[in-house]
C-alpha cells in the first residue's frame, strides 16, 4: 500500500476450483420577489458543500446511489458476547494460522504458492463447507510476466449479499541479497485473523448457511498488492485489480453482478504492531466504524481486552492522516462501500526487515480478533 493525500447466469465452480461464470420531478415556479434570496442561499450552500465534500471524501469514493442495505442490529447479549469471545483460541491463531504464513511469499515464488495452498486447504477443512475458488492469472509487470493467484472463499455463494473481508497474502519483493522480508504485519497477521475468525465461528456460520441467511460471509486473500519495482497504477494491486474486474463480469442474483453483491468490503492491512490507531476513511461506512468503536468500548468495560488501559485505544474519532492506496481501490471505483482497517500512521517496521514475529504485539492481535468476532456475529446475526 502507499500513503498519500493530505498526510491505498451465477458463478459455477470449475473442475479445478477456478472461478468461471455460468453459461425529473415536477417543479413549481416561485414568486419572482422571493427568487433572488433563495438563489443566493443555494449558491452559498452549494459552495460550502463543494469545499466540505472535497475535503471530507476520501480517495476516489464514488457518489453512487447504491447504499448499505443492512440496518444496524442490536448488540449481542452479554452472555452471547462472552461465548463468541471464548470461542477464539489465541494459540491456534498464532501457532496454526500465523506461523505458516511467516515466510517470503513474493508473487510467483515457491513461498507464495505454499501459502496459497495453505489458505485453500485450511478453508476447505472447515465444517461450514465454504465454497473455495482460485483466481489464477498471469500479468505483465516491470519484471516480465508473473503468475498470481487470489483465493476467494464464500460461505454461501447463493446468498443475495456478501459481507466481504479481505487482505493480501503476498510479501514485498526486495533486491537479491537483502534480509528476507516476511511481512508479519504486512499482511500475515490479517490473513491469520481471517482464518481464526472463520474457525472460531464455524458452527454459527454453518447454521447461518443452513438457514439461507440473505447476507453471507466472504473472505478474499489477494495476491500482488505490493509493487514489484515502483508503486504505480500498473505496478501494484495486481490481485485486487484482476478480481474486481472479474467479479464485475460474473452475473449474480439478484444482480446484476458479483461486485454488486458486496454489501460491505472490509480490508485489513498492517495489523499486529502495538498501539494501532484506525480512522474512518469514508463517510459512507462511518456507521460501521462507529460500531467497531462501540464494540471496543464494551469489551474494555467487560474486561475482555488485554493491555488495554483506556476505553478506546484503536478506533479513533477524527480524520485520518491521509489517503492510502490499497487493495480497496479497484472495488471502491466500482461503487463498493469500503471500511479500511489499516493502522495509520503505519507501523514503524513497515517495509523493513524488522517486520517479523518478534516485533508483533500478541495482546493487540488477540484484542482485534475479539472485536472483529463480535462485529461479525452482530452484523450477520449469528
UniProtKB/Swiss-Prot annotation:
Pfam families: Peptidase_M28 (PF04389)
Main localisation: Golgi
UniProt cross-references to InterPro entries, sorted A to Z: M28_QC (IPR037457), Peptidase_M28 (IPR007484), QC/QCL (IPR040234)
Swiss-Prot/TrEMBL keywords: Acyltransferase, Disulfide bond, Golgi apparatus, Membrane, Metal-binding, Transferase, Transmembrane, Transmembrane helix, Zinc
Range of residues in the leader sequence: none
SUPFAM superfamilies the record matches: Zn-dependent exopeptidases
TM helices/strands, residue ranges: 35-55
Sample GO molecular function, one term: zinc ion binding
UniProt topology in membrane: Single-pass type I membrane protein
Alphabetized Gene3D superfamilies for the sequence: Zn peptidases
Subcellular location: Golgi apparatus membrane
Disulphide connectivity of cysteines: 167-191
GO cellular component terms, A-Z: Golgi membrane
Listed GO biological process terms: peptidyl-pyroglutamic acid biosynthetic process, using glutaminyl-peptide cyclotransferase
EC number(s) on file: 2.3.2.5
Catalytic residues (UniProt): 225 (proton acceptor), 269 (proton acceptor)
The family this protein is said to belong to: Belongs to the glutaminyl-peptide cyclotransferase family.
Descriptive protein name: Glutaminyl-peptide cyclotransferase-like protein
Organism: Macaca fascicularis (Crab-eating macaque)
Amino acid at each position: 500500500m502507499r500513503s498519500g493525500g493530505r498526510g491505498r447466469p451465477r458463478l459455477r465452480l470449475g473442475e479445478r476450483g477456478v472461478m468461471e461464470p455460468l453459461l425529473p420531478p415536477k417543479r413549481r415556479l416561485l414568486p419572482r420577489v422571493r427568487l433572488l434570496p433563495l438563489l443566493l442561499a443555494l449558491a452559498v450552500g452549494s459552495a460550502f458543500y463543494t469545499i466540505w465534500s472535497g475535503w471530507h471524501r476520501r480517495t476516489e469514493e464514488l457518489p453512487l446511489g447504491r447504499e448499505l442495505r443492512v440496518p444496524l442490529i442490536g448488540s449481542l447479549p452479554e452472555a452471547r458476547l462472552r461465548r463468541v469471545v471464548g470461542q477464539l483460541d489465541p494459540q491456534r491463531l498464532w501457532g496454526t494460522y500465523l506461523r505458516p504464513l511467516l515466510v517470503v511469499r513474493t508473487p510467483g515464488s515457491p513461498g507464495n504458492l505454499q501459502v496459497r495452498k495453505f489458505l485453500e486447504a485450511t478453508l476447505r477443512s472447515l465444517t461450514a463447507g465454504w465454497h473455495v475458488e482460485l483466481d489464477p492469472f498471469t500479468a505483465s509487470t516491470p519484471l516480465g510476466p508473473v503468475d498470481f493467484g487470489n483465493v476467494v472463499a464464500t460461505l454461501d455463494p447463493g446468498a443475495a449479499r456478501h459481507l466481504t473481508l479481505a487482505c493480501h497474502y503476498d510479501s514485498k519483493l526486495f533486491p537479491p541479497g537483502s534480509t528476507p522480508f516476511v511481512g508479519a504485519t504486512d499482511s500475515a497477521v490479517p490473513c491469520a485473523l481471517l482464518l481464526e475468525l472463520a474457525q472460531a465461528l464455524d458452527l454459527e456460520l454453518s447454521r447461518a448457511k443452513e438457514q439461507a441467511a440473505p447476507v453471507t460471509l466472504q473472505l478474499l486473500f489477494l495476491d500482488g498488492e505490493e509493487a514489484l519495482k515502483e508503486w504505480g497504477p500498473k505496478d501494484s494491486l495486481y490481485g485486487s485489480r484482476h478480481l474486481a474486474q472479474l467479479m464485475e463480469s460474473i452475473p449474480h442474483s439478484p444482480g446484476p453482478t458479483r461486485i454488486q453483491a458486496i454489501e460491505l468490503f472490509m480490508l485489513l492491512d498492517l495489523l499486529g504492531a502495538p498501539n494501532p490507531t484506525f480512522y474512518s476513511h469514508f463517510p459512507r461506512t462511518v456507521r460501521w466504524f462507529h460500531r467497531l468503536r462501540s464494540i471496543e468500548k464494551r469489551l474494555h468495560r467487560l474486561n475482555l481486552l488485554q493491555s488495554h488501559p483506556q476505553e478506546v485505544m484503536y478506533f479513533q474519532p477524527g480524520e485520518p492522516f491521509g489517503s492510502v492506496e490499497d487493495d480497496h481501490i479497484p472495488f471502491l471505483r466500482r461503487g463498493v462501500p469500503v471500511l479500511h482497517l489499516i493502522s495509520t500512521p503505519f507501523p514503524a517496521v513497515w517495509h523493513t526487515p524488522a517486520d517479523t514475529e518478534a516485533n508483533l504485539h500478541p495482546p493487540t492481535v488477540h484484542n482485534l480478533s475479539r472485536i472483529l468476532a463480535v462485529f461479525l456475529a452482530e452484523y450477520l446475526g449469528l
